[in-house]
């Protein structure tokens, strides 16, 4: 509610451009305002670019990425797809997590093959980056079970991320018991 109110004020840009935020809540509000405020896609991308380096935890990352579904991805899906590509190669834990969580908006017929190809190239060591990848694979499985199952059977993912992907699939309420039993049997040692 607070973010929506601030996003409607004329001076929201001053608050969003402030880089001296000390508190989690301030950073969260900035991200939400970037997602909610009325602006053209080009301006929103400008503010996204400024904001991503400020992300320092999974909650800010995930809520920020969720806020961008309608206002960024919904306004220029392929433009945003191109924009997030460098983040998918970042060495920074929360920059790459931002890129991966943004990929959740692309689990569709046009992008599923690219997402699974990217997953096989993924080698980041950071915990929150690996968790995001496991989460993305579980979403891919829910929406594209056959393609994702085929991917999992030949996946080059490291064992930890692979097994965490299986765990997330098993935890899903949208996967039936028989499929969960198959997924359990696919766990790798280590």
Model-derived regions: residue spans:
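Alpha-helical scaffold domains
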Residues: 1-190
């Amino acid at each position: 509610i607070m973010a929506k109110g601030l996003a409607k004020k004329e001076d929201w840009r001053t608050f969003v451009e402030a880089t001296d935020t000390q508190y989690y809540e301030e950073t969260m509000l900035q991200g939400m305002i970037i997602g909610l405020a009325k602006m053209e896609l080009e301006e929103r991308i400008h503010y996204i670019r400024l904001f991503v380096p400020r992300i320092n935890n999974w909650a800010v990352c995930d809520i920020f990425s969720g806020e961008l579904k309608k206002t960024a991805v919904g306004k220029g899906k392929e433009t945003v797809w191109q924009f997030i590509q460098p983040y998918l190669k970042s060495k920074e834990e929360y920059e790459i997590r931002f890129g991966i969580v943004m990929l959740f908006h692309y689990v569709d017929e046009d992008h599923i093959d690219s997402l699974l190809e990217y997953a096989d190239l993924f080698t980041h060591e950071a915990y929150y980056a690996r968790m995001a990848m496991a989460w993305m694979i579980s979403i891919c499985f829910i929406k594209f079970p056959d393609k994702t199952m085929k991917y999992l059977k030949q996946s080059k993912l490291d064992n930890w991320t692979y097994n965490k992907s299986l765990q997330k699939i098993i935890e899903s309420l949208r996967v039936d018991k028989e499929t969960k039993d198959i997924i359990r049997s696919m766990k790798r040692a280590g």
